[in-house]
Each structure stands twice: as structure tokens, then as C-alpha cells.
Swiss-Prot record:
Member of the two-component regulatory system GraR/GraS involved in resistance against cationic antimicrobial peptides (CAMPs). Functions as a sensor protein kinase which phosphorylates GraR through the auxiliary protein GraX. In turn, GraR up-regulates many genes such as adhesins, exoproteins, transporters, toxins, and proteins involved in cell wall synthesis. Down-regulates the expression of many genes involved in RNA and amino acid synthesis or glycolysis. Keywords: Antibiotic resistance, ATP-binding, Cell membrane, Kinase, Membrane, Nucleotide-binding, Transferase, Transmembrane, Transmembrane helix, Two-component regulatory system, Virulence. Gene3D superfamilies: Histidine kinase-like ATPase, C-terminal domain. It catalyses: ATP + protein L-histidine = ADP + protein N-phospho-L-histidine. SUPFAM superfamilies: ATPase domain of HSP90 chaperone/DNA topoisomerase II/histidine kinase, Homodimeric domain of signal transducing histidine kinase. GO terms for molecular function: ATP binding; phosphoprotein phosphatase activity; phosphorelay sensor kinase activity. GO terms for biological process: cellular response to phosphate starvation; response to antibiotic. The keyword Transmembrane helix applies. Its main location: membrane. The lineage of its organism: Bacteria, Bacillati, Bacillota, Bacilli, Bacillales. This is Sensor protein kinase GraS. Interacts with GraX.
Length: 346
């Protein structure tokens, strides 16, 4: 904020003083006009001296009182303002003390709530890890099932449980995702194939195959774990809303950027739903009776893609299917973005 604005604010806040002083001086001038015995020259001298002293007083008061608010305008911490004793007047000191008490109390609440959130996150993480043990044991038991039809049905349900546990684990780690990322060149094809293998029990039951076509060098600079999570959620949606149609997966190269597309021929997304597909908990308005969707998959994808520098495009036609395209960044773009984030944090 420039000095002229500060002067305007100060004068506006002292306008009652200024009007009162002007009123008193005009009153004296008025009295002198009525009382002819009162020397007019002496009165003009007194009024001029009074106004001059008032002007000096206002200037000194301005520099004394505005100093604190200039520190506020620079976003100084209240602790620094209190520690350096930047408040000049008793009212300013009272205001600073009040703000300090309130902000300190709020900070204590935030710290307490953060500790509770951390404990909650740790509890859920431990729960997911603990429950993974019997789920893994369940898989070994299912593999021993002789009846192939029953085995396939059990593997389908097991895959859904395992996928939901992984999704819950990623949700709890969202807040700490930046600390949990490690960027390196990884094979996009390898990640896609690994995720297809994890979903094979679901795809087999639903009669869905995969047409994979990698035409370009598929090594991308990303974090393996979080990138696989994005691919998994998109594949999960494609499988969930498709039936007896193959899912097409491939890569393209545009402006040196590798892009991965996943195309299904399912029911598609309506135009009115499209702006809301990334909202937490949002499910299709066209199928309100559906209970298998949690509305968390694309929310997770949207929450992570920016940290990975991935540009996401979704196109869909109702009754014809959906295409999701992931455009991966170059290494220098990731390094530049991370440098900007680091500078902002300081």
C-alpha cells in the first residue's frame, strides 16, 4: 500500500478531530465578528498558530501510529510485532495483546487438531496394513479352491476388497503425498501391465479384455507409487462401468510429451455430470440406485495429478464410452515446478 493511501486512511480516521478543531477556530472568528472590541489581528494570529500546531501534531501522530499498521500490511507475524514492541499507543498495545492471545489460542487448537489427524491417519494406516495380512491369507486359500466357477467368483470379490483397502490407504496419505514422492524415470508400459494384472480377476468375470498398444518410448519421469494409483483408479472406473467390451490402452507422443490414453466402451458420462466428476464422493446422477461406487476414485486422481505434473483430459459420450488421457511432463518441468514450490515454502 502506498503512502498516499495511508495518509488518506489516517485523515479519514481523524476526521472528527479535524472538524472539531476547525469548528472551534471558526467559532472564535465568529465571536470576533460580533465583539468589535476583540482585536481581529490577534485572533487571526491565534487561529493560524493553532492550525499550524494542529498540522504538526497530526503529522507526528501519523508517523507514530501508522508504523504498526504498515507492519500488518507486510504480513508480519503477531509474535514479531509483540516481541519488537512495535505498538506505540496504549490502544495499539491492547489490540496487539488481544490479537496475540487469540492467534496463540487458535494455533494451539490447530496443533492439537493436527496431532489428532496424524493419530487418525496412523490408526487407519495400521488398520489397513493389519487387515492386509488376513486378506493375503484369504488369497492363498482361494487359490486352493478346486471349483473354478466358485474360485473365479471368490477372486472377483477378493480383488474388490484389496482394491478398496489400497484406495483407503491412499486417501489417508493424501495430506503427506509431497513428502512421500520420489521422482525417477520409470516404464509406463510396466506400470500399466502391473495394474492390469491386479484387475484381471474382475475383468475376467465381466468379460473385458485389454488392447494394449505402446507406440512410443514409454519411460516417463514420475513417482511410481502415486502414478500407479492414478492408473489403477482410471482402470477401476473403466471396468466398473463397462461390460463385455475391451478396454483400449496406448501411448502417443505430442510435443515431446508422452501421453497415456485409457478408452472404454461403457455407459459414458453425461454432460451435466462432467464438471463434477472430480468432486469428493460424487457419483453419477444417472444411476442413483448404484451402491458400488464411492465417488473417491477420480477425486484421488485429481488430488495427486498436479503434484506429479500430469495434465488430465476426460472426454465421454453417453452410451458410447469414456476416454481418459494422461499427459506426462518432462523432467525439467518437474524440477522447475518443485523449485518454485520450495521457494514459496521459504
Amino acid at each position: 500500500m502506498n503512502n498516499l493511501k495511508w495518509v488518506a486512511y489516517f485523515l479519514k480516521s481523524r476526521m472528527n478531530w479535524i472538524f472539531w478543531i476547525l469548528f472551534l477556530n471558526l467559532l472564535m472568528l465568529g465571536i470576533s465578528l460580533i465583539d468589535y472590541d476583540f482585536p481581529i489581528d490577534s485572533l487571526f494570529y491565534i487561529v493560524s498558530l493553532n492550525l499550524s500546531l494542529t498540522m504538526i501534531f497530526l503529522i507526528l501522530t501519523y508517523f507514530k501510529e501508522v508504523k504498526l499498521y504498515k507492519h500488518f500490511d507486510k504480513d508480519k507475524e503477531i509474535e514479531e510485532i509483540k516481541h519488537k514492541d512495535l505498538a506505540e499507543t496504549p490502544f495499539q498495545r491492547h489490540t496487539v495483546d488481544y490479537l496475540y492471545r487469540q492467534i496463540s489460542a487458535h494455533k494451539e487448537k490447530v496443533v492439537e487438531q493436527q496431532l489428532q489427524l496424524n493419530m487418525h491417519e496412523q490408526t487407519i494406516t495400521e488398520f489397513v496394513h493389519d487387515i492386509k495380512t488376513p486378506v493375503t491369507a484369504m488369497k492363498l486359500l482361494i487359490d486352493q479352491e478346486k471349483n473354478q466357477e466358485r474360485k473365479q467368483a471368490l477372486l472377483y470379490e477378493w480383488s474388490r476388497i484389496n482394491s478398496m483397502l489400497d484406495t483407503q490407504l491412499y486417501i489417508t496419505r493424501l495430506e503427506s503425498q509431497r513428502k512421500d514422492m520420489y521422482f525417477d524415470y520409470v516404464s509406463l508400459k510396466r506400470m500399466v501391465i502391473d495394474e492390469i494384472q491386479l484387475t484381471r480377476h474382475i475383468s475376467q468375470v465381466k468379460g473385458i479384455g485389454f488392447d494394449v498398444d505402446f507406440k512410443v518410448d514409454d519411460y516417463v519421469y514420475t513417482d511410481t507409487k502415486w502414478c500407479r494409483m492414478i492408473i489403477r483408479q482410471i482402470l477401476s472406473n473403466a471396468l466398473k462401468y463397462s461390460e463385455n467390451f475391451n478396454i483400449e490402452i496406448g501411448t502417443e507422443l505430442n510435443d515431446q510429451h508422452v501421453s497415456l490414453y485409457i478408452k472404454d466402451y461403457g455407459r459414458g458420462i453425461s454432460k451435466k455430470d462432467m464438471p463434477r466428476i472430480f468432486e469428493r464422493g460424487f457419483t453419477s446422477t444417472a444411476n442413483r440406485n448404484e451402491t458400488t461406487s464411492s465417488g473417491m476414485g477420480l477425486y484421488l486422481v485429481n488430488s495427486v495429478k498436479d503434484q506429479l505434473g500430469i495434465h488430465l483430459q476426460v472426454t465421454s459420450t453417453v452410451g458410447k464410452g469414456t476416454t481418459v488421457r494422461l499427459i506426462f511432463p518432462l523432467q525439467n518441468e518437474i524440477v522447475e515446478r518443485m523449485s518454485e514450490v520450495t521457494n514459496l515454502s521459504f
